Amino acid sequence: MLKVDQISTFYGKVQALDRASIEVGENEIVCIIGANGAGKSTMMRSIMGLVHPKSGTITYQGENITNLKTNQIVSRGIVYVPEGREVFPELSVEENLEMGAFSRKYTAAKMRSLLEEQYAVYPRLKERRKQAAGTLSGGEQQMLAIARGMMSEPKMIMFDEPSLGLAPVIVDEMFDVIVSINRDKHIPVILVEQNAYAALGISQRCYVLENGEIKMSGNSAELREMHEIKKAYLGG
């Protein structure tokens, strides 16, 4: 479904990715782990057209999307839930959700149906639907960011550090939601996450990024048992 082939991405003269390659198949959860500054977020930004690789290609459903603009990539069904949640703080919860469907030009009836679908998944958002998003807790804002991403009915969704700054009980709930999106909606997921243990636990495959290079990849359950992974990322 998605193939990133040997991309090298720079910020000015600083190289963030060095001939990095990943693949995501139909109905997979694929995680990317690595230390801060390893290039994980740059991989997602490259896929979304927020920064363009200097070399290499990105192919989605057989189409070369390497140099497309972000709005063109969004129109193809790829959704990015960035690090830090980035809700619109002055808008209400419901207005934030509607912004997620802005590019789709849905009818009023379709919009209401999608809103109710998200409210069924996140009852707390329904309770707070008229409340300014900036007044929500960190966990509620993260759930809002995920729900907003789902409003456009994505064909693939990418999460960048979704557990950052959240209480453990909220983290567990959030990962359950990500699993259900993949399982129930059959939507492929790319998960960038510093909580490597959790990421390896819910994904089928994983890539390890170090200094912009893919150093290791494979079955997540097998990687979780490897000494090098335990030592570097799992506290063992």
Kindly label every feature range from the protein language model:
Residues 12, 30, 93-110, 121-123, ...:
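ABC-type ATPase nucleotide-binding domains, specifically the catalytic core motifs of the NBD
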Residues 33-35:
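The feature captures the beta-strand-to-loop junction immediately N-terminal to the Walker
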Residues 48:
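Helix-to-loop junction immediately C-terminal to a conserved catalytic motif
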Residues 56-64, 76, 110-115, 218:
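Conserved ABC transporter NBD signature motif
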Residues 91, 136, 149-150:
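ABC ATPase signature
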Residues 151-155:
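A short, proline-enriched helix->beta-strand linker immediately N-terminal to the Walker B motif
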Residues 172-186:
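Helical segment within the ABC ATPase nucleotide-binding domain
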